[in-house]
Amino acid sequence: FLPLLAASFACTVTKKC
């Protein structure tokens, strides 16, 4: 899991970008 991918996933799930 890449850090950038993890950040993108977190953004999608929490709706906090």
UniProtKB/Swiss-Prot annotation:
Disulfides per UniProt: C11-C17
Primary location class: secreted
GO cellular component: extracellular region
Keywords: Amphibian defense peptide, Antibiotic, Antimicrobial, Disulfide bond, Secreted
UniProt record, GO biological process: defense response to bacterium
Recorded coiled-coil stretches: none
Tissue spec: Expressed by the skin glands.
Annotated TM spans: none
Subcellular localization, as worded in the UniProt entry: Secreted
Family: Belongs to the frog skin active peptide (FSAP) family. Brevinin subfamily.
Physiological role: Antimicrobial peptide.
Protein name, as recorded: Brevinin-1AVa
